[in-house]
Structures are given as C-alpha cells and as structure tokens.
Amino acid sequence: MIQGTTSDAGKSTLVAGLCRLARRTGARVAPFKPQNMALNSAVTANGGEIGRAQALQALAAGIEAHTDLNPVLLKPTGDRGAQVIIHGKARANLDARAYHDYKPTAMRAVLESYGRLRGAYDAVIVEGAGSPAEINLREGDIANMGFAEAVDCPVVLVADIDRGGVFAHLVGTLACLSDSERARVRGFVINRFRGDPALLEPGLRWLEARTGKPVLGVLPYLHGLTLDAEDMLPASARTSAARRDAGVLRIVVPALPRISNHTDFDALRAHPRVDFTYWRRGPVPDADLLILPGSKNVLADLAWLRDAGWDALIKRHLRYGGKVIGICGGMQMLGRTLADPHGVEGAAGATSAGLGLLDYATTLTPEKTLVNAAGRLAFGGDARVAGYEIHMGRTEGPALASPALMLAGRGGERPDGALSADGQILATYLHGLFDTPHACAALLEWAGLDGAEALDYPALREASLERLADTFAEHLDLDRVFAAFA
C-alpha cells in the first residue's frame, strides 16, 4: 500500500508507475483505492463510476477499469457534504458527521472489492488517501492505516520534497501513528527532487538512522507528463502554446469552485497551438473560445459565475464573434432555466434562471446517467468522438433539435447537445470531447484555429506512462520495493 504524508504527495502517480512496471514483468496486477474524494471521475464498462486516477492506473496495468478498483468515491457537493458512491452507484448525499456513521457500511464494500481483486490478480497495489496522520479522521478509518490493519497490508510512505519540509513530514507522520502502524511501514520514497542527489545523502542517512526505515528511492521532478489528474487543478493556471508560427487559439475556462472532470481539458493544455488559461480571479484574458466546464453543484457555480460578471462577459464575447462551449454542467448553465425539485444539489425546489443563450431547460434528477459513448460531430466533416456521460439531469427544449453530436445508440444514432443557429455556441453532455484527435482538430478549427493539428492525446498519455515506469526503474530500489509488498 502506498500512503502519503500529504495530499498530492505523488501516491496516484507512484501506483500508476508501479502498475506499469509490474505489467512489464508479466504479472497480472490491479490498482486499488479503498476511498477516494474527487470530482474527476470515469465511467467503467459496466456502467459504474470510479475516480479518474484509478482509471488511469488500470490503463497502466493493462486491465479494464471496473468499480472494484475504487469501491467508495466521495464527490463533494459543498464545503460540508458529498455524494457517496458505493461500487459505482450513487447512494446518498451525506454531511461529514453522517458519513462518519456510514463508514462501517462503506468498509464492508471496501473489503468485498479487495477480496475479489485478491482472488483475480497476482498482485494488488493499494493507494491511500490524503495522509494517515490526520488525527481527527483516524477513528473508523477505511482509507489508510485502518484498511492496512484490517487486511494486514505493508505500507510504503511517499513524501513530496518540492514543497519543503520532507524530513519533518516523514518523521512527523510516523510519530502520529500507533506502534503497530509504524511497524507496518517498510520504507520511504521521496518524490519530486530537483538538483544533485549527492547533496541529499546526509539527510537520507539521518532519516534512516532516526526512523530505522530505509529510503527506497528518490524520484526526480518530471516535467511535461501528460497524465489525468486525480482532483486538483494544475498549479499553473496558464499553458502557453509551444508553436506560434502558424497561429494560436486562446482558450479560457473559469475555475469553478466545484469544477468536475477538468481532465476534459488536458488535451487542449498539451496542444502546441493553444494558449490555455484557467481563470480564477482578476481580469479575464482575451479569448477566442470560452468553455464552461462540468460542475458538481451547477446552481451554486452558476451563481458564482454571475457574481464574477461572466454572464455579461459571455454575451460580449459572442457579440464580437467568439465561440462558447458548455460541457455537462456547463451545458446546463447555457439554457433558460435550471430546477432542482428533488434537492439533488441542495434545497429541494430550488430554481435559477440560466444564462439564456440556448432555448432549453434542465431539471436535476436523482437518477444519474453513467455511460461510455462514441459517435461523431454533427458538423465539421463528421469527425469521430468518444467519451463518457456523467450527469444528474434531464434537458429539454427546441435548441436540441440542432444537436452538436450524434452518438451511437440502440438501433441507430441519438442526438446529443445543441449547436446554436449562428454556429457560435456548442453544448454537450459528453466528457472527453477533445481526447479524440480528429474531433479535437475539428473543434479547434470551428473555434478559429486554421489548419489545427490532430493531437493524439491518448498516445501522449501512453508515452508518459512508459516514461514514468522507466524513471521508476532507474531511481527506485525495485527489489526492496517489491519485497516490501511480498
């Protein structure tokens, strides 16, 4: 089991790289995260929902993603509550106190999934959540040491040296554990190191002498990886185009407080002719294309957009010929009205006017749509698209008579989304819109980029997984790492 001293220490990446290394040996290996809290999720082949990081790890392991890889997924709906997803299906919206009481039920689901994986694979590489040293969360823990103790699982502790204080993080984390939990820790991995490793040696020797635990490797800071993020938005809000000789498209996406599935934009951030910005505050940069992303709380995020002046900004952008895309929650915001009669996102009966840019209305519903989908753009040469739908809502109205996409359905094609009569606004429920090379190129050309290249994002992701595994093979003591898991 890989645990971390902090969130974003590198647990997900370490598990992905180890899965790829184990796959190279011919072993059948599965990733596993007992409990994940994230708004980036993926749809499995059997119609369930898991954390995006576990889908990436499954790709690294060469197996099909399924709900046992992440039996408990928590999707925050606000500062104090989350939607609880068990074995891929939404069960309830609970606040923190109610979820604490629900943990025994969640733990049963975790142990069921782990048992099935242990029976089906040669090895299971487990990822913890956050830190095992969160004292207030230790009672009834199912994500870190509580799980490790329950199944007698050895632990490797990873820490991020780039943020500073790595030795205090490691020693302090051990100090917060019980004697039996400390004994379970087999060693440390230090992540994101920059500089001369020889200068780190005195610190490593001190750490090993102080704790009696070995350092199993020091991983360098890897720039330019193209891998799906578990949850956090990139630290750098802006990505500049690598090529400016043939023209550049400027894209701006508002960093909504409850933004979900922002992995939709990874292909755009990697495109050599795209200037990409996540807008957080201050003046909004000039843009050719504005994209409203998915949201786990559409009504609250729409109010946030209005408070930030984006309703007027979008209308001005359209007057000057700009293009707008709304994806999932962003699609719902573009319509006339939104209604939440069942209290899916908050108080039952809440309603809000939408941005009024497309003639349809959305009603939020308790039933969640979870489906992988493929088809074509309904314009621009019928470029093929493939992605997935994750939403709780039904959208109806005249604008849907001019769909943005045609997706494969039972007995033929089914329409999805809307394209405005003037061709400036595109709305869709499909996540992963830009991941398919020719669809990405067609959409960038629609938005104004002449001769847009067909960037093969899946190939970039695969190359990053290979690079990750090569780096781990060079910088980890793999004999001791895999011995720790034996």
Curated annotation (Swiss-Prot):
GO terms for molecular function: ABC-type vitamin B12 transporter activity; catalytic activity. InterPro entries: Class_I_gatase-like, CobQ/CobB/MinD/ParA_Nub-bd_dom, CobQ_GATase1, CobQ_N, CobQ_synth, GATase_3, P-loop_NTPase. GO terms for biological process: cobalamin biosynthetic process. PROSITE patterns: GATASE_COBBQ (PS51274). It comes from the Bacteria. Residues 248-439 form the GATase cobBQ-type domain. The active site is at 328 (nucleophile), 431. Keywords: Cobalamin biosynthesis, Glutamine amidotransferase. Pathway: Cofactor biosynthesis; adenosylcobalamin biosynthesis. The keyword Magnesium does not apply. Belongs to the CobB/CobQ family. CobQ subfamily. Catalyzes amidations at positions B, D, E, and G on adenosylcobyrinic A,C-diamide. NH(2) groups are provided by glutamine, and one molecule of ATP is hydrogenolyzed for each amidation. This is Cobyric acid synthase.
